[in-house]
Each structure stands twice: as structure tokens, then as C-alpha cells.
Amino acid sequence: MNRPKLLWLQSISCNGNAHSFFNHPNFFLIMSHFKLIYHPLLDTDYTLIDLYNNKLDCDILILEGSFKKELIKHDIDIYALIQSYADRAKWIITAGTCATFGGVFKQNEPESISGFCFDIEEKRNNYKKYAHKLISLPGCPIHPKWLSFVLLMLAKDKKIPIDEFHRPQELYGITVHTGCSRSEYFEWKIDTKGFGFKEGCLFYENGCQAPFTRGSCNKILWNDVSSKTIVGTPCFGCTEPDFPKNTLFTTKTNMGIPAKMPLGIPMRAYLTATGIAKSFKIKRLEERVIEYDSKKTN
């Protein structure tokens, strides 16, 4: 059985998505299903110069980093090189928010930097050309198991249902709030007392974007054990087109009400539920989960 040929190319990148994937607990097993043609951080049979001089066969093209026309690396027009292999590849995966929507680097040159097929939410001119083989995996960085899921699905020639931004619905069909260990505090409108606490919700005052950010971070945990909200840090909304926002640790409010509602929830319904929840005082939820200073502890 011929293994699919895999090619990983970078544009303007911090290498974060590559390093995240390297930390997959089954990285070598996953890669054994593919023939790696080139990766900028790994030893491979071909160099970037080889890719430029020889039009090699490519089944799956993984793109990392934001895109800018006429970007030169090692005297090679990287954007032109990427386009040539995008034409040849059977599948294109944009790994990370930068490659998908523009991400952090777009903040530096908003007019000239974008994702490969999307410029924030807008479709670029090349969208129609590549839409039939495009899979978007935004994240800053990408979760390693999201990428392994897509790679193995493609290797087995399985269909991957996608949303309007070509994100796999299996991974992005829910919000980051789904599975959050703080959901009970969210339901009863109990704020956290600060970052790093196990108790309280981070949505109301501390900028958590999990209720309107698509992703499975609280279902498929990082390192199999944790997530931002579990450790007491707000979700930054890194899988969405408009990441990064200007305020990451503060919730924008209008008259004390979060300016942005949870995904699909009308404001009237939210205000009604909030009014009911705040009329009750749940003693258990006002207490510490673990009393570290208690005399009962050993």
C-alpha cells in the first residue's frame, strides 16, 4: 500500500503549530502512515531548493503561517512555491489560525497579510480554485490531535464534514464552553475571584470567549489533562476569524451585561435566565473546591 505523500510548508510563522504537533503522544506512529517529503524543522530527503527545482508529487499539503505575496526565503518566492504545490496537492490543510485567517501576523500589515484562502472572514480570490480540497484547522497553536484526526481521515479516504470556513464539524461543531469544568458557575452567574482559581466563571468579567468560540478544547484536552479554562485562564477565541482581539482578559460590557452573547442565544433569553439564576444563592458554589489552608488537611 502506497503511503500518502505529505508536504509541510511555512510562510510567516512562529513554528508553534509544528511544535504542537511534534508533542502528539503518538507522533511517530501517525507519521508512519505517510511519506514525509519535506518539513522545515525535520530532516527529510528533500530541501526547499529541491522543492523549487523539482515539481514533486504531493497528496497532502500542510500550510503553516500567514501569507504575503512575494515573501522571499533562501532566494525563493515562498508564496509562488506554495501556490504551485497547492495546485498539485489532493488536499490542502491550513494548520493554525495564521494560515487559515491571517492571525497574529496580520496585525502588523493588515492590508498585505492574510490566511491562504480567507482574509479574516472574507474569501480570497483563490478560494474557488482550492475550496474543493481545503480543510481549515485554526488554533493558536493547533491542537495536535485535531491535525492527526484529519490526517488519518484523509489517509483512509473518509469524508470530513466541514462548516462555512472549512473547519471539520467533528472538531469545531461545538463551542469551547462545551465540557468546561466551570459550566455550573456559568449557569448560576458566579464570577471567579481571579485568574488561576478553580472556582467561578471567567466569562462575565475576565474575557473568556469560550461560549462563542468553536472548538473542542474542553473535550479533547491538551496533553490529555488540561485546557485554558481548567487552569483558570480565559479562552482567547483563537479558532475564530477575528483572533486576536484587542482585549483578552477583560469582558466588554454594556450596563454590566456582556456585549457579546453566547453563540446562538438571544439577549432577551440570556437576560431572563440571568435574572432567574441571580435570584438564588447556591452556598456550595460560593465555597472553595479545595481548602488548602484548612486545618483538616494533612
Language-model features: locations:
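Short acidic, glycine/serine/threonine-rich loops at helix termini
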Residues: 18-20, 74, 103-109, 148-150
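Class I SAM-dependent methyltransferase SAM-binding "motif I" and its flanking Rossmann-like core
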Residues: 103-130, 135-139
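Cofactor-cradling patches in redox/metallo enzymes
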Residues: 56-87, 93, 97, 103-106
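A generic local structural motif
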Residues: 46-50, 78-81, 121-124
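Iron-sulfur (Fe-S) cluster-binding modules
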Residues: 1-62, 83-89, 130-136, 149-298
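Short active-site-adjacent helix-start/loop capping segments
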Residues: 15-16, 44-47, 69-72, 101-103
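Catalytic metal-binding/acid-base residues of hydrolase active sites
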Residues: 98-99, 142
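Short, amphipathic alpha-helical segments
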Residues: 76-79, 137-141, 145
